[in-house]
């Protein structure tokens, strides 16, 4: 048997920590426990200071990105300075081989040469980690289904893939056999959400069970979240309710192109037969607030209801837009001042405020998330002519598109002919290596002005149909 290289499982997080007198550890953690401390299972937030015994290091959350602590509200910062002199130091956290699991499920990806020993490997993992680990599953084959969900073989323990994962102050319920989840991407989720501001409107085209949508809603953003997988949308709604942000998340279950077209349909705008958007009739056409038709332990059919209503695509888009407008009018009160994420407590209190601010996405949205690295680039062309210039207000949105880039490919080749417009100053953030010659990146850029259309012509939609 080849020796297991445990270093391949390591992930290093570059964080910030506060060096404080050890006698103030409890006071500081009480002050920062409302979302500003590192929140990872089995990881201590207060650790020894390698430079001396008189001090301790308090590890800060991933969302604290700046050493001057300007990410933190001034009130908390002032209270902290009253306690002691603030000494901010860099801190590297290494999450090693023994850390990775999803709730009670240990997910393995055993290489071909070790497959003869798979049962032995699984039994050792199960025996040494029970009861924390109650199911050991191995990924089987390559992902080929349309929902990008891997197949698993249960090697040890009970056949129960429904579990809960806690990350950055949020709880995610999922069925590992029905939806996609990667515990190693939590740092990337926080990195991107840290770019959002309270009140921002977010369009999540491939939302999954909510790894971006939930923390964005906790921050006070309005999130239009879509996924093609009905099971993912079921757990997205469930997780929105668990984390008490269901008033901020509107869940859709449809093709991503149709999702964006529906959001950008202006209420009352007449559409001709040439601009009808083709959609798969097996999916409902209307976005539903996450607090409707949802149950954390209910039947998954809740996301499939309405798929047989027989309405044509153009009337559906108009109905959806009118429903959004009605919802916006019911929420005219502005959110209370202060970051909504401050109100998130470990007992999972509902985000404070009267609900999300009015949102008309055909007039303005701030960020679009495209977290489907295997094929998201193919959807960039849906932004060509999507936004009507005469209705748009404010600055153009940021697009965040995840993709894989091989060592033989260049960033220029990735961008060519994807949007039918020149992308100015694209930002490529390297997320992680997925193979020796392949890495996952997040491409971020402002939507070019050339992508806006000048009039009500919908000829561009032919490419979406």
From Swiss-Prot:
CC annotations in GO: cytoplasm; mitochondrial matrix; nucleus
GO MF, any single term: tRNA (guanine(37)-N1)-methyltransferase activity
Residue span of region Disordered: 283-362
Record field: compositional bias (Basic residues): 343-352
Catalytic reactions on record: guanosine(37) in tRNA + S-adenosyl-L-methionine = N(1)-methylguanosine(37) in tRNA + S-adenosyl-L-homocysteine + H(+)
Enzyme Commission number(s) from the entry: 2.1.1.228
Enzyme class (EC, first level): transferase
InterPro entries cross-referenced by the UniProt entry: MeTrfase_TRM5/TYW2, SAM-dependent_MTases_sf, TRM5-TYW2-like_MTfase, TRM5/TYW2-like_N, tRNA_Gua_MeTrfase_euk
Subcellular localization: Mitochondrion matrix; Nucleus; Cytoplasm
Positions with biased composition (Polar residues): 291-320
CDD domains: AdoMet_MTases (cd02440)
Keywords: Cytoplasm, Methyltransferase, Mitochondrion, Nucleus, S-adenosyl-L-methionine, Transferase, tRNA processing
Domain of life, source organism: Eukaryota
Single biological process term from Gene Ontology: tRNA N1-guanine methylation
Binding-site residues for S-adenosyl-L-methionine, renumbered to this chain: 189, 227-228, 255-256, 371
HAMAP family: TRM5
Protein family membership: Belongs to the class I-like SAM-binding methyltransferase superfamily. TRM5/TYW2 family.
Oligomer status and interactors: Monomer.
Role this protein plays: Specifically methylates the N1 position of guanosine-37 in various cytoplasmic and mitochondrial tRNAs. Methylation is not dependent on the nature of the nucleoside 5' of the target nucleoside. This is the first step in the biosynthesis of wybutosine (yW), a modified base adjacent to the anticodon of tRNAs and required for accurate decoding.
Protein's UniProt name: tRNA (guanine(37)-N(1))-methyltransferase
Organism of this sequence: Sorghum bicolor
Lineage: Eukaryota, Viridiplantae, Streptophyta, Embryophyta, Tracheophyta
